[in-house]
């Protein structure tokens, strides 16, 4: 009997338990160190530029509407925070992609209780680098046109008032894609097939992406939550019957 599906927060909570377990802790340390170095550097840079970015994005209002500045300023602060968050998350996941893919493999072994993946070796990890980086570039190709569109929208007066909510929705969707793609890619599921499967599981995907998005906004906590999100996404793949998404692809391959 298959294990029951969970909610987004439950997947993340169970993922955190998994990465803190003795058998998986070792596979978390290296990506955690990479994320820490990147996080410190980005926070240092953003801290020096934050006010300047907010001022550039804020629309210039006539004097009789100047009182609106007090209402709009928090909105544009949120917008800058979201943009910094996106930058950190995308860079961290590109750099740590091979380690995250490998962590996802090991989590799936623990969850399923069977090991269908090759035994660990540094050669195997190195061999994963081209495939995982190519997949990250595919994600970047999906992300950038949409992010650029939202970025341009942020500079259009009046219309830019909806930029922050749109960034939020897009961010939630991207978090689902970013992390659930690790187990999907380990099983060689094509990019378009993976997106189609996530759309079929839209509400479950948005629930998981939403909680991941929320916890990754919390400084320091986000460093540990990134590997927890990888583990939670792998559990999502197993519990939500991700293998079913591979059936059409396997039929095409056989034919």
Curated annotation (Swiss-Prot):
Residue ranges of the TM segments: 26-46, 71-91, 150-170, 211-231
GO biological process: cysteine biosynthetic process; sulfate assimilation
Keyword Cell wall biogenesis/degradation: no
Taxonomic superkingdom: Bacteria
Location of this chain's protein in the cell: Cell inner membrane
Main location class: membrane
Membrane topology: Multi-pass membrane protein
Keyword entries, A-Z: Amino-acid biosynthesis, Cell inner membrane, Cell membrane, Cysteine biosynthesis, Membrane, Sulfate transport, Transmembrane, Transmembrane helix, Transport
GO cellular component, one term: plasma membrane
An annotated Gene Ontology molecular function: high-affinity sulfate:proton symporter activity
Pfam families: EI24 (PF07264)
Protein family membership: Belongs to the CysZ family.
Main function: High affinity, high specificity proton-dependent sulfate transporter, which mediates sulfate uptake. Provides the sulfur source for the cysteine synthesis pathway.
Protein name in the entry: Sulfate transporter CysZ
């Amino acid at each position: 009997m298959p294990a029951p599906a969970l909610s987004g927060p439950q997947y993340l909570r169970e993922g955190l338990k998994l990465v803190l377990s003795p058998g998986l802790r070792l596979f978390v340390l290296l990506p955690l160190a990479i994320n820490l170095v990147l996080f410190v550097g980005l926070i240092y840079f953003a801290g020096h530029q934050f006010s300047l970015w907010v001022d550039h994005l804020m629309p210039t209002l006539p004097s009789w509407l100047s009182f609106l500045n007090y209402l709009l300023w928090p909105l544009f602060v949120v917008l800058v925070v979201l943009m910094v968050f996106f930058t950190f998350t995308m860079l961290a996941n590109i750099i740590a992609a091979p380690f995250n893919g490998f962590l996802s493999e090991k989590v799936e072994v623990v969850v399923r209780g069977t090991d269908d993946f090759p035994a660990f070796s540094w050669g195997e990890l190195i061999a994963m680098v081209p495939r995982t980086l190519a997949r990250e570039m595919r994600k970047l190709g999906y992300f950038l046109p949409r992010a650029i569109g939202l970025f341009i929208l942020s500079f259009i007066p009046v219309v830019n008032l909806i930029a922050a909510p749109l960034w939020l929705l897009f961010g939630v969707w991207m978090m689902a894609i970013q992390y659930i793609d690790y187990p999907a890619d380990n099983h060689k599921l094509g990019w378009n097939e993976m997106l189609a499967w996530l759309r079929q599981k839209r509400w479950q995907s948005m629930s998981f992406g939403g909680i991941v998005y929320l916890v990754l906004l919390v400084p320091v906590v986000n460093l540990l939550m990134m590997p927890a999100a990888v583990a939670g996404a792998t559990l999502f793949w197993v519990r939500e019957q991700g293998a079913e998404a591979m059936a059409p692809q396997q039929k095409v391959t056989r034919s």
